[in-house]
């Protein structure tokens, strides 16, 4: 120990020396930094204090060595200069690091803080002093200034003192160094002490003096040498030699032989419990299953070598008790190992000794494990059900009692409970059989009880008890079965279940459902008897009491019989409760009844239920139950009536309750007739079914009673009785007399009526069925594709019709008798009125109408007749009763019209779905025919009218299809903007049954339906007729049957002349006084208002729409479009005349002033225009035009004549091309701007331009389908920025230029196209392409150069060059920056849909089926998808809005839609043709009959605003 301490003491003088040296350094530093002279205090004599009033705080202090460095150097030099001779200049103290010294703050920051504080105080003072204006405020202002000045002076005096203190502050730095040095030394001492303690506790813990080696010391002292090395050194550094694997194998083999030899000698003493002995690798493993396993070996070959115990493994396990760990702790196992090894060393038979020792230990351990498991069960899951009666570890006995009965005895203390176990199980070790292990004994004994499996190693008391419970439960159930059979011999008791056995008892003889079976089982945990009936409640009193009675030891046969009777009654009551759940009754408690009603129940049995009828709350059904020997349970039903303060029982008939055909009643309404000889099947129905039917019967009788009383109030005779045996069902309310409610004689109807009754159906819901049975029905179905209703075996020509059942269900959930009576009367009135008209019609039908129509259906409340050539038109007749009083004027017939598939297609395999859409035109006049039928009740006349007029009306109805005609160009020409520039092209409506009017603009045609298959058509346009050549139109179709009626019928005056429109314009308003002679009037184009008589075939041909050259039209449509176009063309030409007054922003400024109107008639317009020749616009050369209605083709044509000698290119072929282009492109287009462009093109005559234009038109019209280049002249231009239309061909008169737009594409249907826009210089005869594309400009230069060389006109040369390059793929310009056509639909209005089906615009109540949409050719009036653009490729981009509105005015769709009165499109139409100052033509008739916007002519000096500007869209 002294040698370890010496170094510590050796270092002490050095530390003392260092300490003395440190003290001398401190003294020298203090002497070095002493001041040379004392410093006088501050003049103020006050000490420096830094507080919050000066604006400085400790949080704002920062280190500032930079700003104090200069002052520190000056002070140090001054101090050292005075004492340099005595002390050295170098400071012996260490330097203080930056973060270890005191905190500092820069002086400039401190000054900034002070200045900012003063500035803030001045600002606050200035704001406060402005508010003090009175004398008192003046005094306060002075005081504030004094206080501010004093505080500011004091603050800056402190700063001055601080600055003076900085000169001597350097002397304080030595204190900081001393403090830092002391802290550093203190930390050294602390670290040294910590290190010494760590060395003492760690490294020096084992440092001790070694033992003295005597032998080496003697050798050293005597011999002087050291010859022996200690074995510790050898063992530490020289490892022992390892044996080889072969040697190891030999050793283990030898050990195995020795062990086998030793064990063979001890084999007679080895216990038989050791089931397995394994010898391997020199080890012997002995295994006792379920107890232990040991490993032993021999460490020598001699006989005296003892057995060595290597390992013990206890196989007794319980993971729940040990929580996953072995039951024996390793320390305990080591102790066992040592004790057993010592016992084996002294034992004569070590193997037997080891077995006896470990077997005894394992048996004790197994018993302890079972005790712990039982304790857990007794405290947990099987609490109060098992008990540990005895546990003795020494005797090794464990007694467990189960199925404990708890009872109280008078001998016990209050609160104590006596626990008696019904059964016991004893687990013990037999002293006479030590090798047998634990054994089990049961009290009382029974076969197949639970056993312990000791060989498994994991004993379980739970498994033992579970196996025991199963046997005990079966024992108890068998005993209960014997008791039940002895008490009730007729009771059928069955044992069911294997793992969970139970007894099943059928309480009632007819019990078949498991829910009604009683199940008796035993609770395996406590041994109690459990009874359960699924259909009854689990807490049912009788069920629980019966289970307790069976569990008790005192259960007599009488007690069992009593409980079984109670349970049977309870089961029947529950059956009845469930059977009436779906019926309109509810169970009420006796406490809910009134006191006087309870008195009536005094004598009734206690087992009863009371049912209250929901619809008749004054009636109660009392059902009582009582046990009976024969019927098991006897049921008695009584009806209790509670009215006011009186209650009484009503006697029920026995046949209502017991004599009902329940099976037949279930099949009610299915038309199944039971055999008459078959007896009632009541026996096959259960008791509750009969009760349910009885409840329903009573409910029906109560309902019929109320209903019969209400019918008798109305004067209707009734009889409540049952039907005959072949009619299924119960009661029925038969109606016997209705004479008092029928307003007319109806004897024929009642002769046909066999039975009229009302039945109640309450199977699914509470509904009534009004049932009537008829015979000799007037009309039956006789369509060709169907079969009439006739009996088998009867002749087909029998005149009397078959009897039929008419059973109709009234889907009403109301139980009001008044409502039912009203519905019954309404149904009777409907049948009577329908029969009245149908019976009259049936007489004529058999003689005449069966050749022209067929009966689709007659059901007494509805008649459906198909008529027409194909029997595809339907007339649907019904009668509606609106009023309460029968025969009121409010009642009316429903007369609707519809369609069906033609009869010839019903049996055909192929159906043409692409045929023309059809609709029933009679739907236009359905309201008129309905009113007429209401007045006359004559269905014969109605059907005669329908059959006679269907053919012409189908043809005329083609004009009722909704088609819109664009008015955008026209509205721009006349000035005012129209929000919706479209109008209906045609409007067809009916004035009466025989008069129709077709309106197109201000042209109105009246069509009269005459007898003898004749039609009369006349012009009834307002103020004067306007249809020139109307007679010629029909005469061209059929001259033999067309004639003019001699008697001219006056045109009816307007119903409201003030709103009919302004006076019609006259042609003189648009013509100047000219000296030209007028042409002679063609007599074929005469105008007349006399009716034109024709046949049905003629009008059908005139209205037959066909596809002609890509346009769907008919002769009458072509004629009316021509008349309308002439009127619009006249207004267009007037805008091109010098008299036109144009707007500043009008797009027609470049197209006016060169047209003069010569003459205008309803059938032609003559005008002239100045030519554009090489000298510019020359007024002396004219082009003469005549647009006229051809009397042969009855379509518009044009005649163009140039003055003689003014146009050499006006050859016959070129003029024919120009006129053909007008007929095929300009007129079908129907656009006013297109007409302006056409006139501009035809009046261009400079340098044979007519030839070039004719070539262009020929290329457009004669484009072959196989050509890769399609060229089209653009006639209309749409400005995408202003949304305005304009002529695409314009003339700039001052510059003498004309603008051309040519569309080039691959085909007419191609969506991609290019626009060639160029300017033709009229005087210079060359073209200019205003494009940034250099190729286009180069191409124009080439054409101009060629024209100069060869002469001619460059227009056609340029277009031809473009075509050639387009075919070769060299030209594909991208000049589509301003497309020719774009959207023109107003953005603030949504355009309506295309075409609605006829049902959308037909009269109310129409049943015409929905027709498909418009089949018009899609496209705008000037777009490429229009009818004419598809043929001639005029334009490419469609106009905005739906395609249905992008229509050519002359294009006609397939018939099938209706533009009838009441259509919402009537507000969007532009009525009439166009006159000056208005969009709608003067004198035009608005479509429809009522509800159209009024129009008053403007007074002089007032501007006109079209009424459409003020119409709300969409209309409300």
Curated annotation (Swiss-Prot):
Residues 72-83 have a biased composition (Basic and acidic residues). It is found in: Nucleus. Its main location: nucleus. Component of the Mediator complex. InterPro entries: Med14_N (IPR055122), Med14_RM2 (IPR055113), Mediator_Med14 (IPR013947), RM3_Med14 (IPR056879). It holds the Pfam family RM3_Med14. The gene is rgr-1. Residues 1474-1483 have a biased composition (Gly residues). Component of the Mediator complex, a coactivator involved in the regulated transcription of nearly all RNA polymerase II-dependent genes. Mediator functions as a bridge to convey information from gene-specific regulatory proteins to the basal RNA polymerase II transcription machinery. Mediator is recruited to promoters by direct interactions with regulatory proteins and serves as a scaffold for the assembly of a functional preinitiation complex with RNA polymerase II and the general transcription factors. PANTHER family: MEDIATOR COMPLEX SUBUNIT, MEDIATOR OF RNA POLYMERASE II TRANSCRIPTION SUBUNIT 14. Residues 22-98, 1434-1516 are annotated as: Disordered. Residues 34-47, 1463-1473, 1502-1516 have a biased composition (Low complexity). Keywords: Activator, Nucleus, Transcription, Transcription regulation. One of its GO terms (molecular function) is transcription coregulator activity. GO terms for cellular component: core mediator complex; mediator complex. The keyword Nucleus applies. It comes from the Eukaryota. One of its GO terms (biological process) is regulation of transcription by RNA polymerase II. Signal peptide: none annotated. Belongs to the Mediator complex subunit 14 family. This is Mediator of RNA polymerase II transcription subunit 14.
